[in-house]
Amino acid sequence: MASQEHRRKAAAQTSLYILVIAAIAVVANVLGAKAYKRWDTTQAERYTLSAGSGRLIRGLNSPVQIDAYVKTGLPQLDAFVKDLTDLLKEYERAGGGKFKFTIIEPNTDELRAQAKEAGLTETPFGEANQTGEDQASITQGYMGLVLKYGSEKAVIPQIMQAEGLEFWITNKIREIRDKAENIKHRIGVVTGKDEFKLTDANLVPKQGKGGGGPTMQGIIEQAFPFYKVEEVDLKGGENAIDKDFVGLIITQPQKDYDEKELRRIDEFLMLGNKALVVYASAVTMKANDATMNATLSLHGLDKLLPGYGIKMNKDAVFDYGAQFRIGVPTQGGGFTTVRHPGIAHVVSDSRLDSENDRLLDTSFAGFFRMEEAIFPFASSLTLDKSKQPADVKVAAVARTTPATSVVTSDTVDMKLRAEWEPKPPQEQRVIAATAIGKLKSAFAGSPSDAVKVAERAPTESRILVISSSEFLTNPFAYAGNGPDLGGQFQMFGAVGGDPQLLMFAQPYTKYLTSTILSFKNTLDWMAGDADLVATSAKLIGDPALTYSDISKPKFKAGDDPAEAKKKDEEYRGARKWMQTKVQWTLTFGVPVLFAAFGLFRWQQRKSQRDQLKI
């Protein structure tokens, strides 16, 4: 009886506890209905509005209005509209009254006409039946944004996924703000040196008639029209560079700069609040040259950059610890790995994260929150902070691994091949660096009557040197694409081309998103708008596995081809074994832990019952 009485009391107490907990849950939900808080644990804060977006909105002179035209009725569409609404609410909370939005579902002829007149495009939406039957639900409607600021209007005609949406919304707001307030960001690209051009169509393999293809400048001007990229011909340094440019870009030259031209560049930087970005190295290669035979030349940049504390060395970097790899099919139906140590694949590695050996500085605007970057055909840089005043920061932002050799011969064979032989000595090399502050003139102490330059900039100027000759292009398409005939033969597009190089050019395109975002972030940095670079990180997909727990093969000087192949195979085997362990751990590990916890609780409760005194 005592036992039954005890059980009745326990059951009554349990019921009371359940009622109390349920009441607390109901009250908490009622009180928290209007409260909003979520935690974003992703590295790039993928699901949190960037602080820079909030500052942009709060800094507007008048409120921006967004009309969001949406379509609901399918589970995936409903989920997307909820995510979109949550994001717009975050903008509203961060905007300090400068952001307003309206959700509109065009379910009448009048609203549909309104959406079409605004510039939106009606889109079909489909969703497979989740019951497993061979059926799908199809609907049609509008899913886009209309932005209004002052007298200006802009449209994002179609939005299909929440990932990266903040990037496009924030940059579109910036676009209409700049247009309404007549804010211009003019970027000069130095020309007249047979240089690599941002208008070169070598991002992807050329196919069929018409050649063509996307260009770096075309992508920037179409997606981010608030940047105006203009050519600047120094013409022997006869005239000063237009002071209205926010910055200059130097791309890989084929001809040398003379001293007067370099002094004009220095004169521009000494104006203060200016930027110079150099995408060049000593490794010089010709476009459409399938031999990939490079010559080493600094083209006069060695007379300018050392004065800012960044010396470019006349060498070609070969990084055997972070070399570019690509899998290619074999005749037997398998796959083999082709390596190119002349193309450094720099990955952010927590094991090398001190100021003196960090591989990729992901706090720098150009590589902000990026897990990897590709540096084709780099030269090493030597930093000398004594060349600049103590308050000017000269720092490396990208390095190779310690397993890096350099070649200093006049010509270097960069052609793809099965085996590469490391040469001593091997050490870590700097391949990208910045100098930021009130810069001292690179020609301080050696004035010229032809170009009179201030000894020091009155305000902060910025220099970035990315010592990679083909950073802004696809190196395999650059070498493998056939030349455009031009003139009366233009209709035939590119002719010829190297099939093997073009085969490698296609998989290389997966790295171009990071390259384009790095370039766009660098433009923001040049214009002094680096506050918005955090939004770019949300466009980058989830990074590939880096296998940081597995040591990469260490290629030593003197390794013969057989030894190098053996190390490659051991590395691939270790990666495959790691994949297998992770697979089975995820398959059986969690269920086993759950079962073990259940057994533990069962034994615990059994022990308590056995100890119960009647």
How would you describe each model-predicted region?
Residues A2-I614:
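Short, surface-exposed patches at the edges or C-terminal ends of soluble domains, predominantly
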